[in-house]
């Protein structure tokens, strides 16, 4: 088994005294690829905020086994958190992922940024403002920013909200390569995508239910989402999983 990166035990968290997450325990290991699913308002974003130290737990513990890991977390936010009108170029966005590296010279950051631009296939748009990017281009730009600092843990919050479907398979190929060295936590409402790509799954709906492996079925989903699921086919069910077709 890989080494433990993050250990969360008996976590209670929320806002203004209101509990959003209740008695959460979770372990994340090196090279893990954990998919987090759950209904709106179930606490997925709150859990990520606790891991990122943006909010403090009401009780419980969040322990990084290596203190350096806490300073080496890559984060890719939801698309609605991005101000596309902000006057910044693709290359500048990517280099901003090194802002905490005070010891690095500007020239070194520029060189590292160029390497990441090539790795993500962004050479043709490096000098474009982010407001001119397609969804897929913006997604790759923000992924580059998130991994430029070689994080031990990469957190992706609803990455499918960016995706140009033509580049979806390429995006997950990039994640597969990144996962060889980096643990990944991916939050998504797209349960089909989760099942197809992750190694383990956690359903967050106030409490957390962990499922080792990605071979979940509709009964497990119905129990933890508290609504019907359809595994095969198209329909008007609130959440549905479709096999590849």
Feature locations, PLM:
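Conserved structural motif at the start of ABC-family nucleotide-binding domains
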Residues: 6-8, 21
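Conserved ABC transporter NBD signature motif
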Residues: 57-73
């Amino acid at each position: 088994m890989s080494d433990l990166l993050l250990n969360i035990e008996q976590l209670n968290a929320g806002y203004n005294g209101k509990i959003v997450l209740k008695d959460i325990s979770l372990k994340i290991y090196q090279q893990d690829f954990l998919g987090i699913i759950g209904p709106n308002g179930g606490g997925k974003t709150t859990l990520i905020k606790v891991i990122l130290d943006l909010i403090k737990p009401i009780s419980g513990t969040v322990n990084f086994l290596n203190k350096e890991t806490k300073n080496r977390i890559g984060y890719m936010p939801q698309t609605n958190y991005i101000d596309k009108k902000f006057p910044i170029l693709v290359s500048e966005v990517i280099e901003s992922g090194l802002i905490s590296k005070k010891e690095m010279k500007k020239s070194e950051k520029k060189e590292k940024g160029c390497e990441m631009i090539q790795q993500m296939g962004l050479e043709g748009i490096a000098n474009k403002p982010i407001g001119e990017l397609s969804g897929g281009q913006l997604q790759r730009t923000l992924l580059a920013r998130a991994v430029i600092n070689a994080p031990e843990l990469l957190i992706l919050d609803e990455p499918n909200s960016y995706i140009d479907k033509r580049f979806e398979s390429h995006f997950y190929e990039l994640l597969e390569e990144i996962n060889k060295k980096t643990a990944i936590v991916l939050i998504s409402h797209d349960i089909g995508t989760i099942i197809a790509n992750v190694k383990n799954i956690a359903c967050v709906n106030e409490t957390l239910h962990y499922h080792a492996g990605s071979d979940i079925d509709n009964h497990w989903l119905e129990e933890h989402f508290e609504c019907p699921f359809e595994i095969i086919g198209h329909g008007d069910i609130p959440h549905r999983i479709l096999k590849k077709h």
